[in-house]
């Protein structure tokens, strides 16, 4: 009965500032073509996300991050579009910005874009976010709200560096099958997930702890 009661409670949406990048017909077509090449899915839509990926921006500026994502610049290796983007960016002062709807696929994590929500924390290291109380609180609150809303389990909240061990990872382009990034290392995500769980318990929000990782063959 207690567990059922906890699951029934919903976390209120945190304050989110809508700051959209242009994601019109051209970028949608680019995204669908990208998804076809890399995942075998011809769609720009993010229908049923299973994963939330935490990133940091490697800069100290929301505006610079927004401009990068809005530019739709091709990647330097394959020179393909769409450019990088994330669904949410959290500034140093804790302001949460949303750039695209959660129903739109964003290019932020090789192998997982087809099923992942991307959250970028403005900063230059994991520690720069973990040591910033306002930003960390906003990041945890947003992530927990998304977990509750989209029914994403705690083990499927990952750092970018953990992408290769996600059971949802898939990549058709062979040269990218082992590609990942260094943001949000596993040890720091252990801390982050522990804080997420503590917040869920404090807010009496039921979340699933089921899930698993897979061995990386890279």
Feature map (PLM): residue ranges:
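Structural preference for beta-strand elements that scaffold enzyme active sites
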Residues: 51, 116-118, 156
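Basic/polar, cationic surfaces and motifs that engage anionic cell-wall
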Residues: 11-28, 46, 125-218
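Bacterial N-terminal signal peptides that target proteins for export
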Residues: 1-2
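N-terminal catalytic cores of peptidoglycan-degrading enzymes
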Residues: 6-109
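Short coil-to-beta-strand
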Residues: 110-121
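Short strand-loop junctions, especially beta-strand C-caps/beta-turns
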Residues: 57, 122-124
């Amino acid at each position: 009965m207690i567990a059922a009661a906890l699951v029934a409670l919903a976390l209120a949406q945190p304050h989110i500032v809508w700051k959209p990048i242009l994601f019109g017909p051209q970028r949608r077509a680019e995204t669908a073509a990208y998804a076809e090449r890399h995942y075998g899915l011809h769609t720009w839509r993010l229908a049923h996300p299973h994963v939330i990926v935490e990133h940091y921006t490697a800069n100290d500026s929301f505006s610079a991050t927004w401009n990068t994502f809005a530019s739709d610049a091709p990647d330097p290796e394959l020179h393909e579009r769409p450019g990088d983007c994330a669904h949410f960016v959290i500034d140093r002062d804790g302001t949460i910005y949303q750039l695209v709807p959660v129903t739109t696929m964003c290019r932020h994590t090789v192998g997982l874009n087809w099923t992942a929500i991307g959250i970028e924390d403005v900063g230059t290291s994991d520690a720069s976010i973990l040591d910033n109380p306002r930003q960390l609180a906003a990041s945890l609150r947003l992530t927990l709200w998304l977990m509750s809303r989209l029914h994403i389990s705690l083990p499927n909240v990952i750092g970018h560096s953990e992408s290769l061990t996600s059971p949802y990872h898939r990549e058709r382009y062979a040269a990218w099958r082992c590609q990942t990034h260094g943001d949000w290392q596993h040890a720091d995500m252990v801390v982050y997930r522990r804080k997420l769980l503590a917040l869920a318990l404090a807010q009496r929000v039921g979340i699933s702890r089921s899930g698993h990782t897979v061995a990386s063959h890279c």
